[in-house]
Structure formats: C-alpha cells, structure tokens
A protein has these predicted regions:
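Conserved motor-coupling elements within RecA-like helicase/translocase cores
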Residues: 217-234, 258
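Conserved helicase motor
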Residues: 191, 213-223, 238-243
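ATP-dependent helicase/translocase motor core
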Residues: 1-183, 188, 192, 196-208, ...
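Conserved RecA-like ASCE ATPase "motif II neighborhood" in helicase/translocase motors
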Residues: 233-268, 274
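Conserved helicase ATPase motor motifs in RecA-like P-loop NTPase domains
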Residues: 159-160, 272-274
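A generic local structural motif
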Residues: 40-42, 172-173, 218-222, 250-255
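Acidic/polar loop patches that form or flank catalytic/metal-binding clefts of enzymes
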Residues: 208-215, 274
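Short, solvent-exposed polar/charged micro-motifs at secondary-structure junctions
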Residues: 63-66, 220-225, 245
C-alpha cells in the first residue's frame, strides 16, 4: 500500500488520530474526501484500524469526525467544527492544534468523549458543546459539599437533535467512574421514555448491565440501598419515585437512613416538563 497520510497522532504507541492537511485556499472538503478514499482503499486496516478520530484541516478551517470503520458509512452530518465554550467555531489551525489535538485534550477526546454505540455498531465522537456540558456536570459533582443539604445542581439547555441522551449518559459515566457519587439516577417523566432511554443508555455502555432498569418501586428501593457497584447507574421514572412512600414495598425508616447516607445524583431528562 503506497498511501501515506499527512500526520498520525500516537497514544502509547498506538495510532488513534489521523490528520489530513491541505494548503490555504484548498477547501477542507478535499482533505476529508481524501480520508474517505483512503478508507475505501483499506488504508485503515491492521494496526491502523485503531484510528478513532479523523481530522481534516486547512489553515482557516478544520473538521473532526469518528472513524466509522471498514463497514461503516461516512456521514457529513457528523463532521464537526470544534468550538469554544460559547459555541463559537474555532477554525484557526494553531488554535485547533493547541485546544483539541494537544495533551491532555487529545487523550480525553479518545479516552472519555467517544462512544461505541452498540445500537448501530458505529463509533461516535462528541461535539464540543457536549464535551463542555458533560465536563461541567462532572466538575460540579466533584466540587459538591454533600453535607450541605441546600446545595444546588444545574441545568443544560440543548435543542432537539443535539445529542442530549449521549450527553446525559456520558455525564453519568464520568461521575460513576470518578467515584464522586454513589448513585446516578436517570429520571424520566414518562414510563415509555424510560424504556427507550434505557435501551439507548445500554447501547452506549461498555456492557448492557452497566445501566440498571427498575421494573417496579420495590426494585428501585433495593437498588438505591445496594452497595453493589453494578447498581450505580439506574434508569427510573418519576412515577416509581413518587410511589416510594405510598406502596407496600416502599421505604421504611431503616431504608431511609441507608439511602440518605449515599451521595445520589439525579439527571432529569426533559426537565422543563416536570
């Protein structure tokens, strides 16, 4: 194979980010078209199948996107411009190199902010605003004073189709992996939404049983009390939560003491409705 890419970033000796460069005045589309051509020709096989993220770059514009794999399809809807905290696109190549492609961000992008979606078998990389949101949530939890019963949370306001489900899952995963909370509860306002979200979260997870369902209020109470690490991420509904104090299998005083001593984070989907 005589194909040769422009730049390859290695982490621990493994090729994980491939960068294709074009000179000023040449559209960035030529760079990503070349990456797609290389993929069709089988360049990213063997050792180079480890490449997770592609970057197409010319001095005034850069886009990044996940490697869909040999059997995957490139979709330009998922070619992203990196942006700052205010969602202003960053196009200058020097800023992209320093803010996205340098240590520690390049490590974090590959290690924390890509998701292998089991639903379609395609690797997904998060947009910049998803990164900022998930990072802000996990940082907030890290700094939480759990003894302060009046401690406030926060909200993320993203539009329809912006990837809120992935953002909420990644936030919960970061919190769970950091051990900054004992439980992370995905709270849905409709049972049907809970079923759908459970399927999506399990598709994002490393293993399907990393995200726990709650068939009824009794199961919810049991998993809230549990010290098993497998019961850290839980999907439930407002209905089941509200039934805790009214159903026969709800809480007793001992349960209340056990649960109140745990650090519990609630992530509420469609919070404006509930």
């Amino acid at each position: 194979n005589d194909r040769r890419g422009d730049l390859m970033l290695l982490i621990n000796g493994m090729p994980v980010i491939h960068i294709e460069l074009k000179k000023s005045g040449v559209p960035v589309s030529q760079a990503y078209n070349q990456i797609e051509k290389y993929s069709r020709e089988g360049v990213f096989t063997g050792l180079f199948s480890l490449v997770q993220v592609f970057v197409a770059m010319e001095p005034e514009e850069s886009v990044y996107f996940a490697n869909p794999g040999m059997d995957g399809k490139f979709n330009k809807d998922y070619y992203f411009h990196w942006a700052d905290f205010n969602n202003e696109p960053i196009n200058d190549w020097k800023k992209v190199a320093s803010l996205l492609l340098s240590i520690p961000m390049a490590h974090q992008l590959i290690g924390y902010y890509t998701v292998a979606d089991d639903a379609d078998g395609v690797l997904k990389v998060m947009r910049s605003y998803q990164y900022y949101a998930a990072n802000a949530i996990s940082d907030k939890i890290k700094k939480t004073n759990w003894k302060d019963k009046n401690s406030l949370g926060g909200y993320i306001w993203h539009t329809t189709g912006s990837g809120k489900t992935m953002t909420s899952f990644k936030s919960a995963q970061l919190i769970a992996n950091s051990k900054d909370a004992d439980k992370v509860i995905f709270l849905m306002d409709r049972i049907e939404l809970g079923t759908q979200s459970l399927q999506e979260y399990r598709a994002f997870a490393d293993a399907s049983d990393d995200v726990q369902a709650t068939e009824n209020t009794g199961v919810l109470v049991t998993k809230l009390k549990s010290n098993d690490p497998a019961n850290t991420l839980i999907v439930t509904s407002i209905q089941k939560m509200s039934n805790i104090n009214s159903e026969e299998d709800g809480l007793n005083s001992k349960d209340i003491e056990l649960i109140s001593n745990k650090r519990i984070v609630f992530i509420v989907d469609e919070a404006h409705r509930s």
